């Protein structure tokens, strides 16, 4: 009986020793590896720059250039970045840069850098003749990696804090910006609401 207990203790001691050795050498088992979707960052946004369109017909108007650019893993909140991204949506590139120049938020400086990079990319890689002949067709933010860390409190207590990151995506299109849509009237909102009610379907019926 004593020999069996000693054998179990010895096996447990060897197992603990191996696990400590793995941690010391930086070799973690697969169960400790972070495999969430935030680390699996897709590169689909930049790949849109490589789309090859078919040749245009002789009398067809020239297709405007489209520039996709982004910056990832920004140490900033995605919600705070979204307000700035929505602010410049639909503006010309010069107007957007002017708006961001006089905004004292941290995200405004980051978005301005991304817009200048996209503007240089348009002239260099997409055959855009005039740097100012661009407008912001799409501007949005996304959630990045979220890391949990310990926040030390008094009397031996602690809390969990989150270090959040975000992504910023922008699409520039060659040409003047489209005119803004007129605001909907109350009658138009009511008609749209009535149409939605009439378009409803009953679930699990023909």
Curated annotation (Swiss-Prot):
SS bonds (residue pairs): none
Origin: domain of life: Eukaryota
GO biological process: mitochondrial translation; translation
One cellular component term from this protein's GO annotations in UniProt: mitochondrial large ribosomal subunit
This protein's UniProt keywords: Mitochondrion, Ribonucleoprotein, Ribosomal protein, Transit peptide
UniProt KW Phosphoprotein keyword: no
Cellular localisation: Mitochondrion
The keyword Zinc-finger is annotated on this UniProt entry: no
Transit peptide: 1-40
Gene3D superfamilies found in the cross-reference section: Ribosomal protein L22/L17
GO MF annotation terms: RNA binding; structural constituent of ribosome
Assembly information from the UniProt record: Component of the mitochondrial large ribosomal subunit (mt-LSU). Mature mammalian 55S mitochondrial ribosomes consist of a small (28S) and a large (39S) subunit. The 28S small subunit contains a 12S ribosomal RNA (12S mt-rRNA) and 30 different proteins. The 39S large subunit contains a 16S rRNA (16S mt-rRNA), a copy of mitochondrial valine transfer RNA (mt-tRNA(Val)), which plays an integral structural role, and 52 different proteins.
Family (UniProt): Belongs to the universal ribosomal protein uL22 family.
Protein name: Large ribosomal subunit protein uL22m
